[in-house]
Amino acid sequence: MLYWLAEYLQEYMRGFAVFQYLTVRAILSVLTALGISLLLGPWVIRRLTEMRIGQAVRSDGPQTHLSKSGTPTMGGALILSAMFISTLLWSDFGNRYVWVVLIVTAIFGAVGWVDDYRKVAKRDPKGLPARWKYFWQSIAGFGAAVFLFCTAQAPAETQLFIPFFKNVALNMGLFYIIFTYFVIVGTSNAVNLTDGLDGLAIMPSVMVAGALALIAYLAGHSQFAQYLHIAYIPGAGELAVFCCALVGAGLGFLWFNTYPAQVFMGDVGALALGAALGLVAVIVRHEFVLFIMGGIFVLETVSVILQVASFKLTGRRIFRMAPIHHHFELKGWPEPRVIVRFWIITLVLVLIGLATLKFR
């Protein structure tokens, strides 16, 4: 919105030309989303408390979590609101990537909202039935995959690139659609599984989004892409504005979500953020790098899969409790220690992911 307005006004005042720079708009996107989150956060928490939208805590989980019962949840709506407002203010409306990411993020957020609402307002512990949850996730995931496949303007947009290797790209054909679907839906649910401790999911999401913002900027710039031997995706740079909005909104939310949390993001936030990260990684052709940078999300998901498989096959559990962050809690680690150590691991993995841009 402001991008187009500035484009019009620069004919009369040359100073508005500064808003044509992607880096300027990305920085403003961070600050705008951060400001919105910090300003609206207290009001959102107060409203959720008044509406009795409180988190229900499992009785079979760590006993230290019982004190969290009743903490306002569905705070992910605050993150999404700040993200969307900031993105719409500073991005180029004519960019197809911006719209597909916004729409998919909104759909996954809506699925999470319904799931949270049924759990909290309707007192239904199961929330939205799993079949319906995955049905709507699949609709959005496949829809995005088909759209990107059909609108691809260059072979690189549907090729699979292998990190650490120069000029290694695999033509996927129609398999691109299936692959994209699994990246989007898989990342969405992986972030959701990670969201079990105060600030545990949001900070890694912020770190990964920040890295993806840089990658999107480089992938959308022909000279940088050529120099780094990464896929050049025309228009992908505009996703840096979206990713920066996620960073700002996430940091603002963390202000209230840090231990001890005043609000939880709920499925409305976790599912949406995961889908957004997965889709951006697909567009900029860095799915494997996302797998590296989001290693904590992968670890949490694998721990659940192994736990379920082991119990069904042998009747024994590998971990004291899954996802794995609960395992460490039951071993005696204080919650803040688990959180910060997982953050540190994510920071290291993000740096490794960014290193793949140069080490080829």
From Swiss-Prot:
GO terms for molecular function: metal ion binding; phospho-N-acetylmuramoyl-pentapeptide-transferase activity; UDP-N-acetylmuramoyl-L-alanyl-D-glutamyl-meso-2,6-diaminopimelyl-D-alanyl-D-alanine:undecaprenyl-phosphate transferase activity. The chain crosses the membrane at residues 25-45, 74-94, 97-117, 134-154, 168-188, 199-219, 236-256, 263-283, 288-308, 339-359. Keywords: Cell cycle, Cell division, Cell inner membrane, Cell membrane, Cell shape, Cell wall biogenesis/degradation, Magnesium, Membrane, Metal-binding, Peptidoglycan synthesis, Transferase, Transmembrane, Transmembrane helix. Coiled coil: none annotated. GO terms for cellular component: plasma membrane. It is found in: Cell inner membrane. Its EC number is 2.7.8.13. Its main location: membrane. InterPro entries: Glycosyl_transferase_4 (IPR000715), PNAcMuramoyl-5peptid_Trfase (IPR003524), PNAcMuramoyl-5peptid_Trfase_CS (IPR018480). One of its GO terms (biological process) is peptidoglycan biosynthetic process. Its cofactor is Mg(2+). Pathway: Cell wall biogenesis; peptidoglycan biosynthesis. It catalyses: UDP-N-acetyl-alpha-D-muramoyl-L-alanyl-gamma-D-glutamyl-meso-2,6-diaminopimeloyl-D-alanyl-D-alanine + di-trans,octa-cis-undecaprenyl phosphate = di-trans,octa-cis-undecaprenyl diphospho-N-acetyl-alpha-D-muramoyl-L-alanyl-D-glutamyl-meso-2,6-diaminopimeloyl-D-alanyl-D-alanine + UMP. Signal peptide: none annotated. It is a multi-pass membrane protein. It comes from the Bacteria. Belongs to the glycosyltransferase 4 family. MraY subfamily. Catalyzes the initial step of the lipid cycle reactions in the biosynthesis of the cell wall peptidoglycan: transfers peptidoglycan precursor phospho-MurNAc-pentapeptide from UDP-MurNAc-pentapeptide onto the lipid carrier undecaprenyl phosphate, yielding undecaprenyl-pyrophosphoryl-MurNAc-pentapeptide, known as lipid I. NCBIfam families: mraY. This is Phospho-N-acetylmuramoyl-pentapeptide-transferase.
